[in-house]
């Protein structure tokens, strides 16, 4: 049974919000295929369950980062199209064939190497050629190099040239880099356009039309978050945050003035205080740097005191706090002091890092209307 959990700490995932965000993007780009990006375990929320939910509403194209992530989806019955965005070792090409996956072709050499491992009886492998328009990670940088990849793909019977794509480095900022990258991308692919042409990540999807493309890749915004405050300001799309991180007080104690809390004795009580311990720590994705950060304890903001431990954290709480009191660490209310954006800002990082750090040992509670389905990966 995967619906059991024995530690009162969990992630609430609003599947209705995820569906709403997806539909908003479909309306914004009505003539484009929306590719749902569910890499990094669905941005920490459970890729398999996110995929299953989206498929019920018609989504038929997903993207992940690694071959392992793609195979995991297949093993759990996800039959939709899956594109692996990262570079797969060519010697594993037959795994992609066996599981009917689409792979990224980063250059001509990769195609050559992969062709040596494919067998005549193997099923087709769909390939999306990656163009480096300025990100500097993977992909071809010139039209000549792109055309060479196209020719190499055409020479292998089992390879299907299905798509071409790029990734903008600065679409979440107000600058001209993205326009230049888009022009470079179009110039490179000019004479060889496959079925799918995609260049828009979440930021570009919310900001640009990119009319020469016919697909968009929806990542962080699928889950209700803007890639940057700039994009939030310029976008007309109202995203709905889907994530809430919750824990419950498992121990209450009274301490005296001068008592210390947690490793290194970094917190010293200035008066007699009440301290609640919560069963969540940095092994769950709660950074140690959150010492001093306020959580919401049943409507009252209280500070995390002392260093966050691997499995537990402590907070200074009101005198009348009882065992079982519930705290919100990350809120699904965009205006809350515990919103994902404000948590990330306090930590000096981005929403992506906080979200994808959520551990697989955190049970997920998936909401559709009033219905709740619990999934605990440790009990599957």
From Swiss-Prot:
Organism expressing this protein natively: Macrococcus caseolyticus (strain JCSC5402)
Annotated S-S bridges: none
Sites of N6-(pyridoxal phosphate)lysine modification: 39
Residues annotated as catalytic: 39 (proton acceptor), 263 (proton acceptor)
Enzyme Commission designation: 5.1.1.1
Cofactor: pyridoxal 5'-phosphate
Keywords: Isomerase, Pyridoxal phosphate
GO molecular function, one term: pyridoxal phosphate binding
The family this protein is said to belong to: Belongs to the alanine racemase family.
Catalytic activity: L-alanine = D-alanine
GO cellular component terms, semicolon-separated: cytosol
Name of the encoding gene: alr
Top-level lineage group: Bacteria
InterPro entries xrefs: Ala_racemase, Ala_racemase/Decarboxylase_C, Ala_racemase_C, Ala_racemase_N, Ala_racemase_pyridoxalP-BS, PLP-binding_barrel
The protein's name in its UniProt record: Alanine racemase
CDD domains referenced in this protein's UniProt entry, alphabetically: PLPDE_III_AR
UniProt pathway annotation: Amino-acid biosynthesis; D-alanine biosynthesis; D-alanine from L-alanine: step 1/1
Record's function text: Catalyzes the interconversion of L-alanine and D-alanine. May also act on other amino acids.
Keyword Isomerase in annotation: yes
